[in-house]
Amino acid sequence: MNKLHFGASYYPEHWKEERWAEDIRLMREVNFTVVRMGEFAWSTLEPAEGKFNFDWLDRAIEKLAAAGIVSVLGTPTAAPPAWLIEKYPDLLAVNENGRRVQFGNRCHYCVNSPDFHAATHRIVSAMAEHFGANPAIIGWQIDNEFNRVCYCERCQKFFQQFLASKYSSLAALNEWLSTSYWSQTYSSWEQIPIPIGAHNPGLMLEFKHFVTASYRQFQKLQVDLLRPHLAPDVWITHNFMGWYGGYDHYEMAADLDLASWDWYVPTGHHDYLKSGATHDLTRGFKRKNFWLIETQPGNVNWVPINNSTNKGEARAMAWHAIAHGADAILYWQWRSALGGQEQYHGTLVDQSGKPRPFYEEAQMLGKQMQLVSDLLAGSRMQARVAMLNSYDSRWSIEFQRHHGDFDYVAHFNHYYRALATNNVGVDIISADEPLDDYQLVIVPALVILNEKRVTNLTNFVQRGGHLVLTIRTGMKDEYNALLPSRQPGALAELAGVEVEDYYVLDELVPLEGNLLSGTSKQWAERLKVLDSNMTIPMARYSKSNGWLDGQVAMAVHSFGRGMVYTVGAYLDDPAQQKLINHILQIAGIRVLETPEGVEISQRVDPNDRVIYFVINHTAEARVLTLPWSGFDHLTGRDVRELQLEPYGAAIVTRSDQETA
């Protein structure tokens, strides 16, 4: 079973080799168990075409291993070197304005370039053959933070081929993408452009699918080169960027062994009610624990105000990530580079080679992680609540927000926060996943319906599940065309309501009900009850624009053995909290009350013992009385009352659950 790992990104190629021993000594003192290396080292690993220089990395891996530190290697394809660009200049990506990007940054490649694929094949094959059997390497990272979209003529041609392989004919494409609108009908595949700006919504959605397919193909090229050379327990990952929306992460994660992500707080301080959702999202990519493979040791360097985290805050952030399923915490980076674009980014060791003040905080965290590594081995979250995430629905909204401030992720987090405030564990999973393990499922803005989604949701409620449908759900088909029926489309019978009309709001609209009163912002749907015997209005709009006055804003419908809540309003925070509190109670989901800013999350070990993470996310001390006696594994003490220092944490098991 996996143990906890603690470490950082390390770039030995930046420093003279005689310095490495001191770096490794400091790493051991800070209780590192792992480093990530190599992901930007292409020009050092292959200084000229086909001329490989792996000796330096061999020595670094060996020296680290001798100190008990294992390695994760990154394939260096995010940083194609100058000699490669000079030989193959059209390897550079083209931006949406038709200009080639400039060498000197990263991820500057066209993901569909055959020359780039050939160069990738060469460097990754050589690394796999050379390093693949090294027992000191426990995992591999493919590339780094996939993000570039290319608009070159080659990508346009491949996009046309992608469409031709998906649609049986141009006639089918024209029909499904509604190209008769504005005389967009295509008579040859070669006429189809890469959509830019306010283009055909169906074609825009297909281009997102094409970008996903392109990156997945490029990633799989590397996975397939690596895997034959790796032991079964050596994993392959890619470092995702949380809620980044450039591609479908479920598709991208399918070929990987492990999901990982890079967590940064640009300005201000972390909000655990928000960041928890991103951890849960990443855990959902593979439905298992993940690695936090990059996070900040202090500040970032790429926003207008790059403030540092408070003393102790990064430690609370680390326990927060682990509580939500992270099995590793790696800081970016170990030491400040003397040059390059990230000179001012936070590190553990400064440009002089001396530890920064943050080093002591990391040292404490590393020691604590060692204390509980065995305790947490094999443990995972077990949630009874799921939230369904849909990239195609998100893209559909982003193409046509209708209200400029309407944001899919913000709306998603609006529901998540109300759950997290109650310390309720949540799985964030694909909208196409089965729902057998849950008591409550929340479906935020599932614009796009398909047969699988309708079937899964219907079966879930039929079996006794509680379902929440929010605004904008069930508007479109999988081609991003409006359904020829009212919202929520094929879910209308399940919901017991249909949307007579929807209204974009330029001001708050009041609503009232027996359960709650409040306001709706940005968006309001006028619900029509289809079966008054089985459907109860929960709230109605008060006087507003005339169209909404007295109309149903929320309703609950009994279906099979379950219940469906349709929320046609974008509720204010207090009303939202009341609604979720009520639904949790009805659904039989246990909540845990804590002082403001204190989180309780749970992991369950292979023996079904619950491990409680109690984390103070504030700069002030907090006191919490547990409803049972327990043992704090960080202090080694029996506890009933927890006195948490600012950003302090406790990892507690119940005394009545202790095993021999």
Which residues make up each language-model segment?
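Short, well-ordered coil/turn segments that N-cap beta-strands
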Residues: N2-L4, N31-T33, A65-S71, A133-I138, ...
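The substrate-binding groove and active-site-proximal loops of carbohydrate-active enzymes
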Residues: F6-W15, F40-D55, Q102-H121, D143-C150, ...
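Conserved, mostly hydrophobic/aromatic
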Residues: A8, M27, V35, L64, ...
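Aromatic- and glycine-enriched glycan-recognition loops and surfaces
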Residues: H14-E29, A48-A65, A118, R122, ...
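Short, acidic/polar
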Residues: W15-E29, T120-A126, M241-M252, N310-A318
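Aromatic-lined substrate-binding rim segments of carbohydrate-active enzymes
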Residues: E22-R28, R36-R100, Q222-L230
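Polysaccharide-binding and catalytic clefts of secreted carbohydrate-active enzymes
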Residues: N97-L258, D262-S275
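Carbohydrate-binding surfaces of carbohydrate-active enzymes
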Residues: W189-I192, P232, G242, A253, ...
